[in-house]
Amino acid sequence: IHAGHSYLISQFLSPLTNKRTDEFGGSLENRARLAKLVIEEVRRQVGPFFPIFVRISADEFMEGGNTLDDCLDYLQYFQEEVDVFDVSAGLNGSIQYQIDANYLPDGWRSYMAKAVKERYGKPCMTMGNIRNPQVAEDILAKGDADLIGMGRGLIADPEWVNKVEFGDECDIRKCISCNIGCAGNRIGINRPIRCTVNPSVNGGEDYKKQKINKPCNVVVIGGGTAGLEAACTAAEVGCTTFLIEKKPELGGLAALISKIPDKKRLADFPNYLIHRASKLKNLFIFKNTEATIEMIRSMNPNIIVNATGSNPLLPPIKGLHENIDKEGGKVSSITNMINHVMEYPEDLKGKKVVVIGGGAVGLDVVEFFAPRGADVS
């Protein structure tokens, strides 16, 4: 029974949305009345031996909304018929806590499950950016929760549990909590879910990996995440595959952007792909190598994949396109500047940096540059 996340029961529980003046509004007991009636009726219908799970937003993380203490108080009115509390958080107005943003720590909600468990002695489930098996094990071992819930992690890798039980953790294709293909598609624009790290999600017939029955050579130019995924897929279906990357390291922009403090989680994706590639004997990787026509021809390719990466979006400022990232210039893209700072970490001290754009990327730049002594505006 979903009693959180701004769904109907949650709207009755929350003082932000429940403005009623009858027996269903006002006090905590009144606001919990609908939840109590629904749960009692479900119990009557299913009998005493059928487990009832109730999901709650233990903290709404909105000014004037229910806090964890409020939640612990209103649960008394309907906890008796509940077998397991599924302890979540957030409302539609605090979506970053409802559908965990990637900057929130792994397993960050577990303290709320612990509080509910300690107050009522009921088994509790926790979830929220639990991507690493050890995090899940630690939560269970400490007794903070009794069950681990996972949604996006199983979209990214439906075999997560099997890989933990039988395989290597490095084989897990971990969710990076970007919320683009899953929540962004389904909730944001009402499209079928996809997944940034798993192209087979809703890929249908186009992504069935069928072994080839004749020799085939594939050349992939670019060793970022797209190039690595293409190269691994080609090798896994039986192609002799060559991947050419001009830089010394694989991973592309994902590996680079993971240098930003709140984007460290992004490194999991290229790391997974590099591990996957390392196990394929018919995949040959050339790093620190320029892809020339002569080299490509020598590989006798049947298929060539151009995965040389994307370019940053630039605002329509006169002269910007012609002058950005020029040698000795003062206008730089985020990727070029991060590369520069990683190579020369002291170079920003005392310098004035103007960031154009206050969206997620602009804020990432501020977070990356300010601690390095730059005067950022």
PLM feature segments, named:
Residues 1-221, 225, 229, 233-236, ...:
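Flavin-dependent oxidoreductase catalytic cores
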Residues 212-243, 285-300, 308-317, 334-377:
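Rossmann-like dinucleotide/flavin-binding elements
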Residues 75, 133-137, 274, 293-297, ...:
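Short hydrophobic/charged patches on amphipathic alpha-helices used for structural packing
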Residues 144, 277-285, 324-331, 374:
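A short helix-to-beta-strand connector/capping loop
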Residues 305:
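N-terminal Rossmann-like NAD(P) cofactor-binding module of classical short-chain dehydrogenase/reductase
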Residues 25, 99-103, 258-263, 321-322:
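Short glycine-enriched, charge-decorated loop/helix-capping segments at active-site entrances
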Residues 254-301:
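N-terminal Rossmann-like dinucleotide/flavin-binding domain of flavoprotein oxidoreductases
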